[in-house]
Amino acid sequence: MEEQQKEGEAEVAEHWFSKWERQCLAEAEQEEQLPPELQEEAAAELAGLKSEKQKLWHLFQISATAVAQLYKDSGCQQQGLSMWDPFQNAAMAVTSLYKESGDAHQRSFDLGVQVGHQRRIKDVLEWVKKGRSTIRREDLISFLCGKVPPAPPPPRTPRTPPKPPTGVTSQAVATESSSSVDVDLQPFQEAIALHGLSGAMAGISMRSGDSPQDSGVASSGRRKTSFLEDDLNPFDSEELALHLDSGGIRKRTSAQCSDGITDSPIQKRNRMV
């Protein structure tokens, strides 16, 4: 099952591999085979290192025999026999055993490093062939180190303030519209007050007028007052309320109001009085 799965993944990966990538993978697969001089050692390693073990075992037997003969000759020393020959034989046997053991260990170590390096390359290539066109740095480091990649960080919350509910927005718009209506009422209140003041001033001038000049001024004031009343009659209280409810009143600045009041005939008549 595993072999069939690997073959299927390799077939899928072949579709998105470029020509250069396929060539590199083929060369890497060829390099997995050991050189001829190392193939023999690898074969011996896989077979249990029979030749190395046999050679080391033979040297160990020679060393053990030489050391035992040395102790035997030293215990029952005979006249005319020298102890130099047994000692020399034992020393040479132990030295040969030590040297051959060191060489065998170094050869095995080098062979193991090379085999491990090639196995690591093979594992990485097999991991890349799983259909991944982009490999994250965390995944590669965790794979090479043999650890589990860390969990992704939680998503960041947006820094923008949340939008207010729809009801709150409509209430704010209604408050702004009501405040604008209140502001728009001020010019009309001033106009109504000036209209009432002009009527009162006209009555006073009519009662207190003795000279013909005053009567002429009063008559002219009456004409102007009637003219203003005719102008203001269409804007009575009912129509003003309808205009305010419909929201058709436009804002006027204080400068425009003051200009209109200054240029009005009521202001001119008051100056004459």
Swiss-Prot record:
Q: Which domain of life is it from?
A: Eukaryota
- Pfam families, per the entry: TAPR1-like (PF15251)
What processes does the entry annotate via GO biological process terms? Answer: protein stabilization
Annotated GO MF terms: ubiquitin protein ligase binding
Subcellular location per UniProt equals: Nucleus
Which residue ranges does the record annotate as region Nuclear localization signal?
A: 249-273
Any one Gene Ontology cellular component term annotated for this protein: nucleus
Record's keyword terms, sorted: Nucleus
Comp. bias regions, Pro residues = 149-165
Polar residues: which segments have biased composition? 170-181, 208-218, 254-267
Q: Where is this region: Disordered?
A: 146-181, 204-230, 251-273
What tissues has this protein been observed in?
Expressed in a tissue-restricted manner compared to HAPSTR1.
Please give the subunit comment from the record: Homooligomer. Heterooligomer with HAPSTR1; the interaction is direct and stabilizes HAPSTR1 independently of HUWE1. Interacts with HUWE1.
PANTHER family (alphabetical): HUWE1-ASSOCIATED PROTEIN MODIFYING STRESS RESPONSES 2, UPF0472 PROTEIN C16ORF72
**Family of the protein in this entry:** Belongs to the HAPSTR1 family.
Give the protein's biological function: Together with HAPSTR1 plays a central regulatory role in the cellular response to molecular stressors, such as DNA damage, nutrient scarcity, and protein misfolding. Regulates these multiple stress response signaling pathways by stabilizing HAPSTR1, but also independently of HAPSTR1.
Instruction: Write the protein's name.
Output: HUWE1-associated protein modifying stress responses 2
**What is the organism field in this record?**
Homo sapiens
From which lineage does this chain's organism come?
Eukaryota, Metazoa, Chordata, Craniata, Vertebrata
